[in-house]
Every structure is written in C-alpha cells, then in structure tokens.
Amino acid sequence: MNDRVGPAIIVVLAGTLLGVVAFLGLGLGDDDGSPDASPTTTAPAPVTTVPGAPGTSGGAPTTGAPGSTTTTLPARQPDEVPAWTVGRPWGSVRGVTMFRGNPTRTFHGAGPIPDSPTVAWTYPDQAMCGSSSVGGETTTWCGLGWTGQPVVYEREDGITEIIFGAYDKSVHFVNAADGTDLRPPFRTGDIIKGSVTLDPDGYPLIYFGSRDNKLRIVALDRETPTEMWSLDANEVRGVWNNDWDGNPVIVDDIMYEGGENGWFFAYQLNRSYGTDGLVTIDPQRLVAMPGYDDLLIQRSGRNVSIESSVAVFDQRVYFANSGGRVVGLDVSDIRNGNAPIVFDYWAGGDIDATPVVDADGFVYVSIEYEPSLGRSTNLQRNREVGQLIKLDPYTDGDPLVWGIDLTQAGADTGIWATPALYEGYLYVPTHHGELLAVDTDTGDIVWTDNVAWHTWTSPLVIDGTLIQATCNGEIRAYSLDDPASPSPLWTTQWAESCLEATPVLWNGSIYIGSRDGYFRALR
C-alpha cells in the first residue's frame, strides 16, 4: 500500500487536476441467504498482451480537453489507481466511460459550460417504457432513472456517440449531433437501472447489468451489438434479488462489480483480438465473495444487496451495501485470487450511493435514512453515524472522521446521490430536497439551497461550475468562484417529470434521461 499523500500536496493536486479532459478508456431468485456460503476463487489465466492495443497500464498516458494540446501525465504501476488520477478521466480514448468517469468516481465530464441551455434534441420518437415485476407486482417503468448516467464516446471516425441503458429493457447508441440511432438497440429481458461502462482501454466492448439477472459484456465491432459473455446472478447463493444496479469498473483487464444478490465479483477479462481483427474475451473469475456475514444479517436483516458502484484507489477496492456495510479489499494480489478485507465499517443505514475517494485516500459515503422500513437497530446506528460520512480506511483507530445527521422527525430522508468533490468541499443533494456544500476537513455544512424533494441525481462539478438536476425537471448551475458559497448562474426547466438519472456534460452539451420516457441533449 502507498502511504497517504500529505494534505497540502493533495489540495494543490486536486485544484490543478480537476476538470482536465483526457484520452479516456473505451461501464428475484434464490433467497436462501446463507451467509456461510464460501467465497470462490479461480486462478487467473495468463494476461494476454496485444501488440499495439491501447491500455491504461504503465507508460505515461496523455490527456487533453477537446481541441487542446496533450499533456504527459505521470506513469502508474499496473493494478494501481494512484492519487493523481482523482478528478481525471480514465483510459486511452476521450469521453466519459463509466459512472462518475473514473475508478475513484470523481470525473464528471468536460466543458465548456452552456449558458441557460435549451433542448437541442429529444430521443426517441416514442417513450422508452417497459414492464417489470417486483414481489409479484408488475408495473410500467419509463425513461431513465437512478443511476442512469450515459457514456460519452469520442469515436475515431469523428462521431460522438452517447450510450445508455433505459427502462425499455435496451441499451441505446445515439449520435450526439442529432439524436439519431447509430446502432440498433441491444435488447435484454428486463429493465436497465444502472449505468453502462465503455471499455476504458479502447477495446470495442461495453459492460452493464439488467434486471433479467444478467451482467453482460457486449461487443461493438460486429454488424450489430453482440453479446460475448454474461454472468447470471443465480450462479451463487445470494440474497435479496438478482438485479445489477452497480456500474462495472475496469482496471488493467480486471472487472470489479457488485450485485443485488449481495456478492462482489472480480474477473480477469483476457481481452484480445482474433485473427479476423474482431475483439475477443475470455473472462476468468478471480474472486466471488458475499458482501455480508452472519453479524450483518443479524444487525440489518436480509437486505444486503450491493446497489452502489465499486470504487478503486491505490490497490484497494471499496464497495457498500444496503445493510450499511462499507468494505475495503486489498487487491494487490488479485491476479492470484486473493482479495483480503482490510477495511470493514458498519454505518447502519442503506447505502445505494457510490463511495467517492479523494486524492488523500479518504472515503465519502452517502447513506439513506428509512424509518418506514422499521429496522430499529439499523436506525439507531444510522442516527449515531449520520447520513453523510467521511472515513479514514487506513487508521488503526475509529475510521469515522465526521458524520452529518440529516434525519427529519420520522421521515424517510438521507442521500441517494453520489457526492462531488471540489477544492476542499463536497456537494450533494438530500432526498428531503436540500443541496449541501460541506467542508471536507471539518464536516461543517457551509451552504445550502432548496431543490426538489427526491433529488437522487448526482451533481457535476466542471470548470468551476456546479450543476444539479432535480426531481421537478430543473437543471441548475452555480458558480464555484467561492467554493464555500456557490452562487446561482442559471436555472432551466424543460421537463415536467422527475430527473433521477445522473447527467453528463461534454463539450458544451448536457445529456440526461428523464422519467417521462425520453433522453435529451441540452445546449
């Protein structure tokens, strides 16, 4: 493990690096719930190196904003996500390739920031809707919801492609210029709630899960998008359900992902190209382990699903689950099937938001508060810890640096959104309807603004501007000239329905899906 970088150095690095755009990487079954199910490991196949294939490991990667000159970045070691990557894009091809842009979940896109944008196009002609069943009840879902962030893919042919999964059970591939289809949609057997990952090393592959129990890898270099591999959640004895809300993260040919069955997985992908020039994969399981144990089931009940996305920093992987457990794994020997738990913290409340890691290695976690579920032990711990917390995963003492109590007299509240970090402050909306600015050193709330109830969409910080979508169809922009006191720049309201999905901003355009069934570009 690397020693933590000093705070003073990190402040400088974070301020210098944030917002730079880089060449990015091409994101209900058996409820037995036996927490004594044994983790399984498989010895990895040898790494296949393709001459001339793009990659993120070793060397000195380059990065540059659209139209800018490139900048040489420090080299990094294989299987490591170093501090200097915080706030930067990840990989070798320009764009935004996963939920929150990189393994630390701290890159949100690239400017320029539009001024009072309006709708440039709406996709498709008819609402994207699909039926889905939970607990024997079938309902209709429309559009994009939580988390639902699109991928931005700057292709070598000059086309910018927007890729997203939707509630019509399909992944869509849309031309950013005019909102037309670039490829036929890829259909699955149920709705898609999470965010798609585009391969961060340039291979023509996407990674995503669906409520049809399957985590998939799909190739984009065929005549139509083609499934190459899938993992059925029923392959292990899990709990709760078999959805895949989390966004897969790829670090040096290894995919990390958690499922709503409560299990964490690591696969070596063995990506390559065949003699016909088409991409190939041969995924080998390195680790499969339950994210819960007997004690967690006793404390929190059987809802121990992993709905958050995995975050990676240094040679550690972090995930959280609905039982309130935050876990850190040492993946320095992951290729030999070893990923011991080196950090384990119980926060008490349901954690669906994705952990965020700053350049100093601290972990920030958003937590829900749900008295309507009636779990008294869980709620007591939830109130003690708070619903927004900062953790030190390297200390031998109490890892809780600070926690903020956001409870509201018996009401469901807390946070579903993933925070944004900027210049020593954290920005995040609450379910109750407040947008917060928090001093990351002290945990003090230094600024608030009232936004809509049920704001689950995660904020963006790009070029010193904070952007927040809301559940009343608004998008708001704030200047961060003074990061402790954001000042309003503009508000645009263009939808009557809730914006639950997280937007992405790229080259002057905001791309976002809505619960009304449609996806839009604003410029």
Residue ranges and their predicted role:
Residues G15-G19:
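Bacterial N-terminal signal peptides
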Residues A37-T72:
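Extracellular mucin-like PTS domains
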Residues V5, D32-S34, S38, S332, ...:
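Intrinsically disordered, low-complexity regions of eukaryotic proteins
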Residues G67-R94, F99, T106-W146, V151-D245, ...:
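Extracytoplasmic/lumenal domain signature
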